């Protein structure tokens, strides 16, 4: 039984050393997402602009608030 466990551990150790650090950095840099916005961001921006415009549309109103 110990022999089987040692063989499993040897296999795991070999898998851990499969990639070099440079390979991992290359993989990580290749998977980056450009922009970083969520699909909800444009809708939230439009809603915020609408509320802002209809709540206090002028600087005179803003000062009165």
From Swiss-Prot:
2,3-didehydrobutyrine sites (modified residues): 38, 41
Modification type 2,3-didehydroalanine (Ser): residues: 45, 48
UniProt GO cellular component terms: extracellular region
Cross-link (Lanthionine (Ser-Cys)) at residue(s): 52-56
A GO BP annotation: killing of cells of another organism
Gene Ontology MF terms in the entry: signaling receptor binding
Annotated positions of the 2-oxobutanoic acid modification: 37
Localization per Swiss-Prot or TrEMBL: Secreted
UniProt keyword list: Antibiotic, Antimicrobial, Bacteriocin, Lantibiotic, Plasmid, Secreted, Thioether bond
Subcellular location, principal: secreted
Post-translational modification: Maturation of lantibiotics involves the enzymatic conversion of Thr, and Ser into dehydrated AA and the formation of thioether bonds with cysteine. This is followed by membrane translocation and cleavage of the modified precursor. It is not established whether the 2,3-didehydrobutyrines are the E- or Z-isomers. In the NMR model they were assumed to be the Z-isomer.
Cleaved propeptide residues: 1-36
Function: Lanthionine-containing peptide antibiotic (lantibiotic) active on Gram-positive bacteria. The bactericidal activity of lantibiotics is based on depolarization of energized bacterial cytoplasmic membranes, initiated by the formation of aqueous transmembrane pores. When present individually lacticin 3147 A2 exhibits weak activity towards L.lactis strain AM2 and L.lactis strain HP, and no activity towards L.lactis strain IFPL359, but when combined with lacticin 3147 A1 it displays strong activity towards all three strains.
Name this protein carries in UniProt: Lantibiotic lacticin 3147 A2
UniProt organism field: Lactococcus lactis subsp. lactis
Annotated gene: ltnA2
